[in-house]
């Protein structure tokens, strides 16, 4: 539908309108032209490292990701140390009830966040998606803050994950120095990223398959153990049930304990939004993204909520092995490993430790991918040095990738006596950072819908709509704010058994992400000095993807006669 047919007018550029024409043009559904040489396209020869030259209207990044890649990134991409290891510390602080409820609340939030992101990513599949949406639909300065916050988040996560990899290996061999393992895994991450988006996609596909299969195996075994089907020489040889929900209790340390689990839940879900970032490098986002977005429901429900429910049934929250203070670093504190150990299942603890190792390595690869693409998008908008706009012939943003990888060397600091201090500060930077990204996605979706209506469009012109609509985004934004408030409360009043909060240093270790985001926003505003975007000045046309409306309308016609309950299932699951 043309602009004249739809009856809307693109807002004129004024003082508070950002020009996106330079970086986001209408994208053809078949994607950009690609180099004829297969080795060049996949970064396998010297020529692939040369700068790529673009014709008018071409996008900057290659789009090699297929539907299977997006589906597995959505369903298993962010399952890592926060879920497998950090959940142990959360259980120790808040008890099984808080663990279950807090992850459920964050899961509801993420359900709405990912659907809102999916709607925007299908409409505007651009590099650095959520940063671009914040700058485009909310405020350029806020977009600057969200972009650099996201880059910093992943820059902090990479050395964290490398450190966890080294410590995880020590479960089997403590004689070889951790530095050797950090070097090995950093090398693996570099090699995978040399293959660009396709390397990331393939690694995530197979790593996610492994993580999800392992989690399913764990839940089947856990179900048997809860019913008392464990080995005779183990703990769970009699009916176990929900005894730990009664003694020592479902909710530990009261309201403080309940609030303290939120930060672990947020850290565990970090990376879920990468499926939106990957849309810019997907062969056909319109066709592939909806199915990938719908996978998030199953991951939240089955793998996070149900998996941690079994953890709460089988592991005592007072177990001394749950090292709250080192819960993100030491796989020995993983409740998944402890279940196998206490059950007397020979080799199961080693299997779960291997799963943890694969998971944290996967998150490290994701960190380089997500951070580098966002940094490139920032540079394209003039919010980062021009050097980072460089894209080679295989679609790799090489300077941005190198920039992120350099942060991996911080992991070697963990070998020093001051290592734990550095680890705490890295965790402080990354722990809550994702909440600001998720809240911004919801707010950008709300603002987009408002501007879409203002400029004369209807909801029928949106090919994929968020399941909860704009109300789901309001709910997601509300939960983000509540979680940030809850974490502020625990930062000034820590639950019993947690490191004390009596100094400014202790407070900022709990809440550093907030002043960091505020600082980025101030810098962005001082740099561009552009006011908050008003609805009439939000441009909803530039960069809008072309759609095959015959195919979309045919699908809608097929679904329309179905009963209401079947239509809900189709749109949601």
UniProtKB/Swiss-Prot annotation:
Pfam families: AA_permease
Location relative to the cell: Membrane
TM region positions: 72-92, 99-117, 176-200, 212-229, 257-280, 296-315, 351-371, 398-415, 425-444, 470-494, 511-527
UniProt keyword annotations, A-Z: Amino-acid transport, Membrane, Transmembrane, Transmembrane helix, Transport
Single GO MF annotation: amino acid transmembrane transporter activity
Topology versus the membrane: Multi-pass membrane protein
UniProt keyword annotation of Transport present: yes
Listed GO CC annotations: membrane
Regulation: induction: During mycoparasitism.
Sequence similarity: Belongs to the amino acid-polyamine-organocation (APC) superfamily.
The name this protein goes by in its record: Amino-acid permease inda1
